[in-house]
Amino acid sequence: MEEKIEMSMLLDFYGILLTDKQKSIMNLYCNEDFSLAEISEHTKTSRQAVHDIIKRCGKLLKSYEEKLKLMGKHIEKIKAKKNMLNKLDYLKENCKEEELQKLIEELKNELNNSLGG
């Protein structure tokens, strides 16, 4: 996983545990794709301080994930739901009974809704 994408996801899960300034700088860096110089100018902080905050927060976010594993669990749930959808597709294609096909379609819809679409 690309470093910024991973940091962005970790920020989504654990950003609330950071200070407002840390969260703001990490958001600008990860989600808004600001350079260190742009963040420095925007926050009126030295470039070196911005760099240090990003490195420190990155380590902090990774340590939260190592301990709590929220992002890992979330990714595993998504994979499991997609796997279930694939199995339901297989069953629907190979099933001849109309009532069972309807039930499979309802289950697929519920899983799709829980995946956000």
UniProtKB/Swiss-Prot annotation:
It holds the Pfam family UPF0122. Gene3D superfamilies: Winged helix-like DNA-binding domain superfamily/Winged helix DNA-binding domain. InterPro entries: RNA_pol_sigma_r3/r4-like (IPR013324), UPF0122 (IPR007394), UPF0122_fam_protein (IPR054831), WH-like_DNA-bd_sf (IPR036388). Coiled coil: none annotated. It comes from the Bacteria. Belongs to the UPF0122 family. HAMAP family: UPF0122. Might take part in the signal recognition particle (SRP) pathway. This is inferred from the conservation of its genetic proximity to ftsY/ffh. May be a regulatory protein. This is UPF0122 protein CTC_01247. It comes from Clostridium tetani (strain Massachusetts / E88). The lineage of its organism: Bacteria, Bacillati, Bacillota, Clostridia, Eubacteriales.
